[in-house]
Amino acid sequence: VLHYLTTPKFENKPRDCERPLAIMHVPKTAGTSVVTGISQSLKVSEEVRGIDGLLLGTFDRFSEFDDEVSRTIYLDLSKMPDAKLIMGHFSRNTLTARYPDAQLLTFLREPLSRLLSHWVYWRCMSDEYLARWGAWQDCIKLSRGTLREFLTDPRIACQTDNLATRMLLWPDKRIGNDSFIDPERDSSLLRDALNRLNAFAYSDVIENPHFHANLSKWLNIELPVMHLNPTDRVPENLRIRLDKELDQETLWLLDHRCRLDAKLWASLARRRLPKGGEIPSLQRQITLKAIARYGALLAP
């Protein structure tokens, strides 16, 4: 009860159709289906999609990217065109700096299930696709090793370590681009991340049974129901037993890489889910289902 009373209320603001809409899409939150539905429904003439430098850590060999990939990466805010709809893996800072008048929207997913999905999704990427990313493919290929290796390589801490928190706060000296977050900074980072999330015009957890209806009502449109960009069955040569991956150390790493995001998600879930729901029980249910799902996709 005390936690409920002391955390932000995350009260959604009314939609202002005169203002741009900017979506902070956290990877693997089922956001591709949502943003595509929003795009198709709003039918705006100016739209921006892509990513910023947050997801690339300290990587700087951008000249190796093929042209199609390069067009989706915005390292210079001045090169982001004016738009009414901005959707992508952009940090909050990128969105507010380039589109200060935009209403911000984001969704959170239970973070351990999101992180497992991220690992398996990368593991499914073909060599042909990865070649378009130049030397960054070496970082994505870390997903082809053990889950423990994926969770401990600092080159991809920018995507594996409390990603939602990073997207809310980046750039921030307390968060390294190629290092894991120091637990001694957790309290101040969580406080600031909660306050940033509280300032969004609209936010929700994707596990909300009324997620689709509530978002449609806020946007004053009927969003189509889609299921795009799902995580596929892992290629045969990369299949492993997930139960053997989840030893005590790896389970600790999963919890540690999600510790801040888990508190963000739980705080928002308490405000969004029907009253009476037990958040810890729901979180366990979601993670157990995720382990079963991704275990099946990985199974030899």
Predicted regions: what is each one?
Residues V1-R19, L282-P300:
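Juxtamembrane luminal stem/stalk of type II transmembrane Golgi/ER carbohydrate-processing enzymes
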Residues Y4-K9, L55-F107, S113-H227:
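PAPS-dependent sulfotransferase catalytic domain
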Residues M24-V34:
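Glycine-rich phosphate-binding P-loop
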Residues T32-V34, R114, W265:
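General alpha-helical segment detector with a strong preference for membrane-spanning helices
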Residues S33-E47:
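A conserved segment at the C-terminal end of the G1
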Residues G50-D52:
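Short beta-strand-centered segment that lines the nucleotide-binding/catalytic pocket of NTP-utilizing
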Residues H89-F90, N177, E207, P224-A296:
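PAPS-dependent sulfotransferase catalytic core
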